[in-house]
A protein has these predicted regions:
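Long, charged, low-complexity, helical-prone intrinsically disordered regions
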Residues: 1-278
Length: 278
């Protein structure tokens, strides 16, 4: 569950809005006719891709980044946060959108504090172990409050919480290529403290400043993060081109074979042929 699920309970809702919520609210109000047009179109013909929705915004979305003037995309994002619109699947690379009332179960909306508690519990279940209190981020929180039970991480300061349902469970490690947005690496501070893994997504860096590649994938082996895969999908050529496997530790024969299998599996999933470096 992402942070927008909590925002549905908070905005619109009771209490004072945070600064960014006030800005967003004002923009949505200024473009309320566009909001209504989108909802009416979805009500009549949804689910639909964004290309079939009307952009009747009178006040463009202004930013200094790549979202500048992307009115429909930003309006849909805000309607998702408001609990009015939801993703309904996809066709190819296009996401489909529909009225949230057709997608979400008709369950009573919990109070804000109850929603926070449930999110903390789900977040901890996904992470296994996490800080009780962490840095405030504009995206999904990285801490879990009082969910779970107290834990101590040897050599790392701070208050930690552990999911009691996972204590004592047998662990079977495996090899995996992770998304740069996987929960295991999304919290860079936790990643460094628990795994001593140096990694950052470099797609926003100039090419000459990159160390591991434009969209390098962290490599998991067993219970350690051991490297990064620099690969690119050449769809016209039908190939998954592997530029490098950056090894943070020496790879054993078994590790090399396991990572190679993951690369082949990724290529098969993408319907591409893997091309390894010479």
């Amino acid at each position: 569950m992402c942070s927008s699920d909590l925002e549905m309970a908070e905005w619109p809702g009771s209490g004072e809005l945070r600064e960014w919520q006030e800005d967003v609210r004002d923009w949505v109000i200024a473009n309320n006719a566009c909001r209504r047009d989108i909802l009416e179109r979805l009500r009549a013909d949804g689910p639909l891709p964004i290309s079939e929705l009307p952009d009747t915004c009178v006040v463009p979305w202004a930013s200094s980044g790549w979202n500048n003037n992307r009115n429909l995309r930003m309006m849909l994002d805000k309607l998702v946060q408001r609990g009015e619109v939801a993703a309904a699947g996809g066709t190819g690379r296009d996401r489909l959108w529909d009225l949230a009332s057709r997608i979400y179960p008709d369950d009573p909306v919990p109070p804000v504090e109850e929603a926070r508690r449930r999110l903390d519990e789900r977040r901890l279940h996904g992470l296994g172990i996490a800080r009780a209190k962490g840095t405030k981020l504009p995206i999904e929180p990285v801490d879990v409050g009082e969910a779970g039970e107290p834990a101590v991480v040897e050599g790392v300061r701070g208050r930690w919480r552990v999911d009691p349902a996972q204590l004592g469970r047998p662990f079977a490690g495996r090899a995996a290529l992770l998304s740069p947005f996987d929960r295991l690496v999304a919290d860079r501070k936790r990643m460094d403290e628990l795994f001593e893994f140096d990694y950052i997504l470099e797609m926003y860096k100039p090419s000459g400043a990159r160390i591991w590649g434009y969209y390098a994938l962290p490599i998991l082996y067993g219970d350690r993060l051991v490297g990064k895969l620099d690969a690119r999908a050449d769809r016209e050529g039908g190939e998954l081109r592997v530029a490098a496997v950056h090894r943070d530790v020496p790879f054993s024969t078994a590790m090399t074979a396991a990572v190679d299998r993951e690369i082949r599996d990724l290529a098969r999933w993408l319907d591409l042929e893997p091309v390894m470096p010479d």
